[in-house]
Amino acid sequence: MVTGVASAMAERLKEDGNNCFKKERFGAAIDAYTEAIALSPNVPAYWTNRALCHMKRKDWTKVEEDCRKAIQLVHNSVKAHYMLGLALLQKKEFTNGVKELQRALDLGRCSNPTGYMVEEIWEELSKAKYMEWELVSAMRSWELNSLKETCEAALNQQRALDMSRTEESSDEAYTAHTERLKALERVFKKAAEEDKPTEVPDYLCCNITLEIFRDPVISPSGVTYERAAILEHLKKVGKFDPITREKIDPANLVPNLAIKEAVAAYLEKHVWAYKMGC
């Protein structure tokens, strides 16, 4: 059991660590947080603070260890899931890394939807998703090209075999062979379309940011905006709808779950859209 004295000492050590961190003395900060953990090991912030220091030093193994411990103590730690996701991405564990970043994003949106961390997490999640897609897309493209070449070679061999069995080639046989090659080209062109970036549909994009929705909300006038963008507009420009000019109270903004689900479905099928504007 941690005594009150030990808890107070741990808090002072945490403050020492925070001061060292601000001065970019990450080694000293780690030492302070480590002492705090020794005195009071069940405080998640000590573990996430130390993990942040390890992250600054790019010691990703220790980042992962500290974040996992923090999550054991409190499962809804935005910072712990976020840094764990980054650590896993560094280990090329894209699937698990993306999963942790998505968890951090969901938690962040619930606790502080307009906070800086939500934007930061989204940016990292987008990069991770796009990077994962690039790797998969490159492999898929190579496989398609390899298969296409094999199919073309097989058709050409069949054409040569057919010609060897007859003394003279007919126009019909030549035309049939050409049509088979064209059909093959169409099939593989269609298969490659999945990985070809196109324009994102307008209804999935915010009229303010001109980017695909992340956290869409609908105004009383029926127009959907990105939550952070419309809140910033209401705060800095005025409490009115930027399109209809009708007055808006931030409390009247409602999550547009239908658009959010549509965006999720679109991104699931078109991962390249994480990096595209509208």
From Swiss-Prot:
Q: What does this protein do?
A: Has E3 ubiquitin-protein ligase activity and may target misfolded substrates towards proteasomal degradation. Regulates the activity of some serine/threonine-protein phosphatases by E3 ubiquitin-protein ligase activity. Required for responses to biotic and abiotic stresses such as auxin, abscisic acid (ABA), low and high temperature and darkness, probably through the activation of serine/threonine-protein phosphatase and the subsequent modification of the plasma membrane composition. Regulates the chloroplastic Clp proteolytic activity in response to stresses.
Task: Kindly give the SMART domains that the UniProt entry links to this protein.
Answer: TPR (SM00028), Ubox (SM00504)
Amino-acid biosynthesis listed as a keyword:
no
Show me the TPR repeat boundaries.
10-43, 45-77, 78-111
Record's protein name: E3 ubiquitin-protein ligase CHIP
**GO terms under biological process:** protein ubiquitination; response to abscisic acid; response to salt stress; response to temperature stimulus
Group of enzyme by EC = transferase
Q: What is its EC number?
A: 2.3.2.27
Which reactions appear under catalytic activity for this entry? Answer: S-ubiquitinyl-[E2 ubiquitin-conjugating enzyme]-L-cysteine + [acceptor protein]-L-lysine = [E2 ubiquitin-conjugating enzyme]-L-cysteine + N(6)-ubiquitinyl-[acceptor protein]-L-lysine
- Provide the alphabetized UniProt keywords: Coiled coil, Repeat, TPR repeat, Transferase, Ubl conjugation pathway
What are the inducing conditions? By abiotic stresses such as chilling, heat-shock and salts (selenate and NaCl).
Q: From which organism does this entry originate?
A: Arabidopsis thaliana (Mouse-ear cress)
Q: Which residues form the U-box domain?
A: 199-273
Superkingdom field? Eukaryota
Name any one GO molecular function: ubiquitin-protein transferase activity
